From Swiss-Prot:
A Pfam family the protein falls into: Ribosomal_S8
Family: Belongs to the universal ribosomal protein uS8 family.
Keywords: Ribonucleoprotein, Ribosomal protein, RNA-binding, rRNA-binding
Function statement: One of the primary rRNA binding proteins, it binds directly to 16S rRNA central domain where it helps coordinate assembly of the platform of the 30S subunit.
Stated name of the protein: Small ribosomal subunit protein uS8
Subunit structure: Part of the 30S ribosomal subunit.
UniProt key word Ribonucleoprotein: yes
GO terms, biological process: translation
Organism listed in the record: Methanoregula boonei (strain DSM 21154 / JCM 14090 / 6A8)
Single GO term (MF): rRNA binding
One CC-aspect GO term: ribosome
Phylogenetic lineage: Archaea, Methanobacteriati, Methanobacteriota, Stenosarchaea group, Methanomicrobia
Length: 130
């Protein structure tokens, strides 16, 4: 089966596994962008860790969950966000101020909206988690 949006598939797999109380989930096919998003979620404490498994068909990401994900998802289409527009998008996707993360792709790499604001740069919205 062809996957059209691996980020959306991966984020929905995380949410579904968290809702059913699973401790780990396997996401396939893997991508570098999804791996970078998982690294940000791991740094924030939403997941315990993840590992890449090569299977000859695009690879898999095995994610170890902590049970802290209430909701996560991909943002489609990927909106371009400037620094002064960040608060508007926070209100759209996050339930409260200083609660949750939006993940952005910037010219300095993939990072959370908090880090992007600290560095004074904008980017494209990829997803959110809280």
């Amino acid at each position: 089966m062809t996957r059209l949006n691996t980020i959306a598939d991966g984020m929905s797999a995380l949410k579904n596994a968290g809702d059913t109380g699973k401790s780990e989930v396997t996401i396939e096919p893997a991508s570098k962008l999804l791996g970078a998003m998982l690294r940000i979620m791991q740094d924030a404490g939403y997941i315990a860790g993840f590992e890449f498994i090569e299977d000859g068909r695009g690879g898999q990401l095995k994610v170890h969950l902590t049970g802290k994900i209430n909701k996560c998802g991909a943002i489609c289409p990927r909106f371009s966000v400037q620094l002064d527009e960040m608060e508007y998008w926070e209100k759209q996707y996050l339930p409260g101020k200083n609660f949750g993360l939006m993940i952005l792709s910037t010219s300095h790499g993939v990072m959370s909206h908090v880090q992007a604001r600290r560095e004074g740069i904008g980017g494209e919205l990829l997803g959110y988690v809280y």
